[in-house]
Each structure stands twice: as structure tokens, then as C-alpha cells.
Amino acid sequence: MAPRKRSHHGLGFLCCFGGSDIPEINLRDNHPLQFMEFSSPIPNAEELNIRFAELVDELDLTDKNREAMFALPPEKKWQIYCSKKKEQEDPNKLATSWPDYYIDRINSMAAMQSLYAFDEEETEMRNQVVEDLKTALRTQPMRFVTRFIELEGLTCLLNFLRSMDHATCESRIHTSLIGCIKALMNNSQGRAHVLAQPEAISTIAQSLRTENSKTKVAVLEILGAVCLVPGGHKKVLQAMLHYQVYAAERTRFQTLLNELDRSLGRYRDEVNLKTAIMSFINAVLNAGAGEDNLEFRLHLRYEFLMLGIQPVIDKLRQHENAILDKHLDFFEMVRNEDDLELARRFDMVHIDTKSASQMFELIHKKLKYTEAYPCLLSVLHHCLQMPYKRNGGYFQQWQLLDRILQQIVLQDERGVDPDLAPLENFNVKNIVNMLINENEVKQWRDQAEKFRKEHMELVSRLERKERECETKTLEKEEMMRTLNKMKDKLARESQELRQARGQVAELVAQLSELSTGPVSSPPPPGGPLTLSSSMTTNDLPPPPPPLPFACCPPPPPPPLPPGGPPTPPGAPPCLGMGLPLPQDPYPSSDVPLRKKRVPQPSHPLKSFNWVKLNEERVPGTVWNEIDDMQVFRILDLEDFEKMFSAYQRHQKELGSTEDIYLASRKVKELSVIDGRRAQNCIILLSKLKLSNEEIRQAILKMDEQEDLAKDMLEQLLKFIPEKSDIDLLEEHKHEIERMARADRFLYEMSRIDHYQQRLQALFFKKKFQERLAEAKPKVEAILLASRELVRSKRLRQMLEVILAIGNFMNKGQRGGAYGFRVASLNKIADTKSSIDRNISLLHYLIMILEKHFPDILNMPSELQHLPEAAKVNLAELEKEVGNLRRGLRAVEVELEYQRRQVREPSDKFVPVMSDFITVSSFSFSELEDQLNEARDKFAKALMHFGEHDSKMQPDEFFGIFDTFLQAFSEARQDLEAMRRRKEEEERRARMEAMLKEQRERERWQRQRKVLAAGSSLEEGGEFDDLVSALRSGEVFDKDLCKLKRSRKRSGSQALEVTRERAINRLNY
């Protein structure tokens, strides 16, 4: 069952809670209303309403009070206004009409209270000052309260309360100071200021430590009323915690229970104090978190019950005071209702919270078959092990356990504590989250890691398939576009061929007519031959179709080695030119070179990358005089083998037997590649995540499955095995299993025929479309921008306007111009107006265009490709096109070579690259045609603007127009901003005039009503009403009635249940 939410309908009559009934205005006595005569006559209605509205604004009234005030007749309004003005102008009150006077006096009183012993007259005067301040805070206009707050008047009062001595604490001054704070809180602005002060409520609570019952009553009324204000309940609980420390209480609220049980001897004072205490207890129990939180009410009420409040309540019944009995009834009724609610949760009629055995049985019954039951047993088991001494030395451990349980019950899901008494900064939710089973967390973590790896693998496979699909799709689309273009080109060439055949037929017919005519003189020797008359058009063979790309000649055969076979007798001389062979510059010798007996190392060594001299070139050189065999006798070959061994060893001294054993078990790796290069190669292979065989198959199949990304191919090109690397690796190919990873990779790649050329062709294929897509927009930008500049009519019209303005402005040699260089366009903005330096000639040009030639303003829409063309560097573009041309040529050469070779079954270089060359050659030829056309159009554009004699590049030429268009657009924005600023200033001026007129009209139109007549304005306020309702118990009237009705219903139901149980027992 959900906890019962408590509401305070009894507060409906209060102004601060929006009561619905407007009280009547009653006179204090039975005398008739006497009008006061004033020297000044009553002004007209409009002026009276304006003056009266100013007065009402000063009084800080509620909406209903304002309505009642404005509903008064004009004579009454004028009487109230004149009386208030007369009070403000009273010369006897000028000194005390401002808060500065009171603040200075109270500060001096606080400073001198411990220095002097004041007599009775001086004490009375000091008390009168505080009383006057209390009255001023209630009766003075709103500006007085505002000024008091601004001058830190509240801080002055709080400091006085903190520093007062015992004599002052027991005097009427203390009561009056609390009254000043209460009067300040009777104002909405003052109340907000008090609640905003962090230590204000705690300082007020400190005043409970006095023997003056009136002071205690005033403090309790303030604290009880603050409980009912939004956000005040928690501040009051914190204030009572502060008072526990301040007054050295054993438990919180101990002083209140002592005062509730103590007898003062004076009936009136005793009843007032006990009523204030009970009203405060009911407010703190049922307001704030107690409105809808059953656990909070049970928790806080249990604190009072443990202090012994129930016997005290029974004792208070003897006073037979109606208001006090109302508070006692409300306390007991709410307690009984909450106990019933708690019992319903356990399907019980009543729970004896004083019986440990009954509470344990209920908890045992509730948790017996739940997962929490082992935890209950653990709690009890560890409670048995808690330290125990007869003298109670371990009370704090049990207190800690109690407070932890209180915190668990009270703290909500957001971690908010309605009461800070149990444990501060103790977040139950965070601790519960930390107590989750670690094994379960580890299990989920392992499973999540497994799923993560599977997910990453699937994502990787999906990405490869997507790349493969995307590549195939792009190739298919490009092939279809190329096929369509080739069809169109074939149709055009067929048309041209038919036209050419028709022209040939006509020419043949003409030749036939000429041959049948008069015989002409024979042609001169060596003249052109004529076609025979029998030759017709059909006899002409058709021209061969154009090849998609030029075939390259086979590579030249390698040159013969120097010691090749001699030329056979009768063979033509070398080079086919009849020239004798050149003599060998190295003379041969008939003395054979001695055979070298080089010592063999015990294991492979690193190689020395030298270029070996041929033996036939040694005679006659210094090498013929050198004998390296003598050096071997001097060298320490064993040390040399250790230093330059091809096996990689760790630089570690093998001193102990364990080191020798571990070293012997390590696998020796053979590495002949440079260390830095090998390390970079290993890093690349780790990024590829492919085996050597997978990389090899991907290269042979031209990366069908898109395993090799473009950036990886670019990196692989940096690790092409060089000839020296291949020679070294070939020497140790019998030890391939011992090779380091980088060495083995380079060795296996070197076994692929034309590995470097294949890799370059594959990389070119992957990058071709991207490079083509980068080059085409640049070519098209130049082409389209050139066309747009030449064809733009609006640009031509604007140049006419600029030429006219320039000829009008310039005289002498600069005047009378027929045209100007295009670079002059960007100098228009440099000419500033003589009247306004913010206006340039460009701004004025736009004004002219807006007024006389508005269509020219749309000129940028005709020149949309200028920004792109201004970024194109023609030299770099032509260089890129040349690189593409050379790349295609290199692929064609490699394709011709691979066609002559015997291929492996998995080698797909020829079919893949043949299709690629077919499509890419056509696309590239189209790009070249576009580039040639763009050059022509650009040259025409230069000539069109008279710049044909200059050597402007496209980026410079188009950049001039692009810069001008940007400046043109910015100038238009500047003009638009100037217009908006001007319009905004005019609109603001109109709005200010309208607002001023509206304020004047509203000042006399506001008609309100008030709760009492003008004379009652000095008495009471909304905070006083709240305190009064709390004191009388009217705050709880609605809830009390509801509880009584609920109690009757529940009592009758309980009676019926008891009867049924008795009958069942008898039947049984």
C-alpha cells in the first residue's frame, strides 16, 4: 500500500497559501468614520490613482490586499494617502525613518554590552530602540525593508544574538530581537533573505537556550512556521542538529522534551510554551519530507518516543486547554494512523515496537523464503560477535549500526537525505552498487570480452566485404560508363566513315569524268599516281578500329655477358654497321689467377654488400698485387664469427648454469636485413594482420577480397626487396625456417615474378579512380568558369557601369578609357567616401545597382564555378595528368610482359589489368580531351577581357573575379547591416515611447482590494498569519478531521474482523 500523502488544506485561508475568501473590512470601534480635513484638495481621479498606486507599491501587499485597497472610495484613498505622507514628513520621525539609525544603535549596543553595567533606565532605552525597529519593519514602506537588507541589517541582528551576554539573553531585548527577525520575515523580500542566509535559522535556534519563556515561544513559532515554507523543513532539522552541539544535548530535541515536561508555575506562560512546543513537533513531523514519507515520520517520531514523549502527553491532558489538546490529539491520531499503515505491510492489526521478539518474528516471517534471508542470518551472527561489556564501553559500535540502518531507510533513490542526523555524506546507493557479486561481474566481463572480440572480427570481415563490394560496384559503374561512351564514339566515327566514303565516291566519279575527257599531258616524273577508273568505293578497305591504348614494344634483350661465346665465322660484324669491335680496356693475361682458399665459418655470417670485380679485370691492377690470405693468419676468426653472426642473440652474459640452459633453449633467428628496416617491416606486418602466404595470394589475385588497403600498399612499396637483399637471402634460403619475420617476408615476396612491378600496378589501379576524380573537377572548373565569364550578361553590364563611373571620376591620362585591366576590379573598395569613411566606392556601386540595375545583383548566380577555378594550379594539374599518363604506360608494359610468361593458376594479373587498362585508358583520354578544351576556353576568356598579352594562370585570373565577388557580397552585407541598425534604432525609439505611455496608463488603472482598512495596514502580515494558524492548530484542522473519519472506519472494520475470528475459533 502506498504511503499516505499529507496535505495542508487547513492553510487555505492564509494569504501566502492563496486563500479564496476575501475578509471584510471592519472598524475597531463603534464611532462613525470622521473625515480629516487637509489643506490640499482631492485631486482628479487619474492623479489620485497614480499617487495611491505609489503608496500601495511601497507597502508590499499581497494581490488580494491590493485589490481591496484599490476598491476603496476616493475619499478614503485620499485620507490614507495624506496620513501616510504626513507621517513620513513628520520632523520628529526623520531620524528614525531610515534603517541606518537602528543598525548603528544595535551595533553599538552589541559592542558595549560586556563593557558597562547599565541601569534600569538605560536598559529600558535600549529595549525601546529594538522595539522601535520591530515596529518600523512592520509599518514602514517597502523601501525601508529593502534598505535594511542592503545595509546588512539581518547580519547585524544575528551577530547581536550570537554575542549577547547572559544578562541580555534573559532580558526583554532578546525577545525583541527575535521579534525583529519575525517582523522582517513577515515581508516576502525579508523572508527570502532570512532563508538565504546559511546560518540564520541555526542562530535563531540558539535562542532556545534561555529561561525567558516568551523568547522560547517566539523562536519555536518561527521554527514551526519555517517548517511549512518550501525548503525550510530541512533547514530546521539542521538547526536542531546545530543546537544539539551548541547546548551539549545527549540527543536531539532533548531540551524541548525537558521544557515540555517541566512546570513553570505560571499557568498562562506554561500553556503558551507547551502549545508552541507541540505545534513545532507536529510541524516538524508532518511538514516537508513528512508529508508523503511514512518511513520519515516513523523515524522522527521514534526519536521523540525514545525521549519519553508519550508519558508527557498523558500528563499534558491535565491542563484541559482546548488549543493544546488539539495539538495533542493531532499527534496521537497521526501516530495511530502511521502504526496501522506499518502493520498493514505485515498483514497485522498492531505491531508492538517495544517487543524485540515480535519484531524479529515479523522480519523472520517476511524474509524466510527470500534471497535476503542469508543476509539476515549473517547480520544476527555478526551481532552476536559484537564487542560487549557490562559498563557499556562499546555503545558507539551499536550506535553506528543503528545510524547506518536509519540512513538506508530514509535516503531516497537519488541519494537525497531528508534528515542529516543519522550519517552525513553517506550514500547508500553507491555502497549497494559496490556490493554487487564480484564473480558475477567477472563472468559478465569475460563474456563481454568474448562478444567484443567476435564483434570486432565480424566488423573486420564486414568492412572487407563492404570494401570489396564497393570496389566491384565502382568498377562496374565505371565500365558501364566507359562502354556507353565507347558506343557513342563508335556511332560518331561510323557516321564520319560514311561521310568519308561518300566524299571518296564523289572524288572517284570526278576522276572518271576527267579520264574520259581530253587527254592531258603525262604527269611529270615522280608525280602523284592516280587511281584507276575501275577502283570504286567498295574496293577501299575500311580503316582499322582505334586501339584502346597504345601497345608497348617488348623490352630489349639483356646485353651479352663479357665472356660470351665468340662470333661464328661468316657472321656480319657487330651492330650490322661493318665497324670493328672496341678493344677491351682491361688487357688480358695468360697467367691464371691462383685459387683462393678462404676459411669457412662454422655458421652463417652477415654479408658485406660489395660489388665484386670480374676476374678478367684483375690483371694489371692493384688487386693483382694483394694477397689477402696473409690476413687470415692474423685475424681472430672465432671472435669475428661471434661479432658478425647472422643469428640474432640477446646481449647477455651467460654466467650461471640456468642462463646457459635458458640460452640453449632459445630459438636462434637468422636476420641479414638492416635492423631499423626490419623493425619497421615487422610493424607494418603486424598492422596488416595477414600471413605471408595470404599477402602473396592477395598480390597474385590482384587483391580480389580487398585485404590490402591503399595506405598499406603504399607502405609495402617502401619494403621492396633490393637486389642486395635478395642475394643475401638466397644464400640462406636453406635456413628459411630460422629466418626472422621480416627476412622471411622479403624472401617470400622476392619469389614472386616482377613483385615490385605487380605491387606498383596494383597500387596504381586502386588509386587511379581517386586521382582521376581529383583531377576532373579541376579541369571542369576551368572549363565552366571560362564559359561563365564570357557568357555572363550581368557581368558585362556591371563592367559598363564601372567603366562609366571610372571615366567620370578620372581626368587626364586616366580618363577617356575604353576598358580597364580586370585586376582593377579589386581596387574599387580602396576608394573611400569623403563624407563617411565606412562607405567605399564599392558600397556606392551596389547602391547604384540596387536603385537602377537590380538585375545585376544576381550576377554571382551566373558565376558559380569561379571559387573552384580560382584554386586550380594549372602547372600542378598538367603534372598530375602527366603522371597518370606515365603510370598507365608502365602498367601496359608490365601487362605485355606478363602475357608472355607462364602464369600460376591463381595469378589473375593479366585478366584483371586488361579490363582495367581498357576502361582507364578511355577515361584518361576523355580527361585529356577536357584539359585541351579547358586550355582553349581559358585562352578565349583571356582574350575576351583583353588579357591575352599577359601570362596569367587560371588561379590568378579567376582569383581576381572571385575576390571581387567576395568583396561584392561583403559590401552588400555591410549595407544590409547598416539598414538593420537604423531600423532597430527607430523601432527602439518607438517602443520606448509606447512603454512609457503604457506605464503611465497602468499606474492609474490598477484597482485592487485589501484585507483591512488603511488603519489596519500597520498590523500583521502573511508570516504572522502563518504563525497564528500554527499556534491555534488550524493548520492541522483538515487533516485532523480526515484522520478522525478514517479512524472510525478502521475501528469498525477491525471490530468486524475480530468478531469473525472469534466465530471461526468457536466453530473450529
UniProtKB/Swiss-Prot annotation:
Interacts with DVL3. Interacts with INF2. Key regulator of the Wnt signaling pathway, which is required for various processes during development, such as dorsal patterning, determination of left/right symmetry or myelination in the central nervous system. Acts downstream of Wnt ligands and upstream of beta-catenin (CTNNB1). Required for canonical Wnt signaling pathway during patterning in the dorsal spinal cord by promoting the aggregation of Disheveled (Dvl) complexes, thereby clustering and formation of Wnt receptor signalosomes and potentiating Wnt activity. Residues 518-594 form the FH1 domain. Keywords: Coiled coil, Disease variant, Phosphoprotein, Wnt signaling pathway. Gene3D superfamilies: Formin, FH2 domain (1.20.58.2220), Formin, FH3 diaphanous domain (1.10.238.150), Leucine-rich Repeat Variant (1.25.10.10). Residues 595-994 form the FH2 domain. Residues 40-416 form the GBD/FH3 domain. The modification Phosphoserine is found at S1015. InterPro entries: ARM-like (IPR011989), ARM-type_fold (IPR016024), DAD_dom (IPR014767), FH2_Formin (IPR015425), FH2_Formin_sf (IPR042201), FH3_dom (IPR010472), Formin_Homology (IPR051425), GBD/FH3_dom (IPR014768). Expressed in most tissues examined. Expressed in kidney glomeruli. It comes from the Eukaryota. GO terms for cellular component: extracellular exosome. The DAD domain regulates activation via an autoinhibitory interaction with the GBD/FH3 domain. This autoinhibition is released upon competitive binding of an activated GTPase. The release of DAD allows the FH2 domain to then nucleate and elongate nonbranched actin filaments. It holds the Pfam family Drf_GBD. Residues 434-516 form a coiled coil. GO terms for biological process: actin cytoskeleton organization; determination of left/right symmetry; dorsal spinal cord development; negative regulation of oligodendrocyte differentiation; podocyte cell migration; positive regulation of canonical Wnt signaling pathway; positive regulation of cell migration; regulation of actin cytoskeleton organization. Residues 540-572 have a biased composition (Pro residues). GO terms for molecular function: actin binding; small GTPase binding. This is Disheveled-associated activator of morphogenesis 2. Belongs to the formin homology family. Residues 514-586 are annotated as: Disordered. Residues 1016-1048 form the DAD domain. It is linked to Nephrotic syndrome 24: A form of nephrotic syndrome, a renal disease clinically characterized by severe proteinuria, resulting in complications such as hypoalbuminemia, hyperlipidemia and edema. Kidney biopsies show non-specific histologic changes such as focal segmental glomerulosclerosis and diffuse mesangial proliferation. Some affected individuals have an inherited steroid-resistant form that progresses to end-stage renal failure. NPHS24 is an autosomal recessive, slowly progressive form. Most patients eventually develop end-stage renal disease.
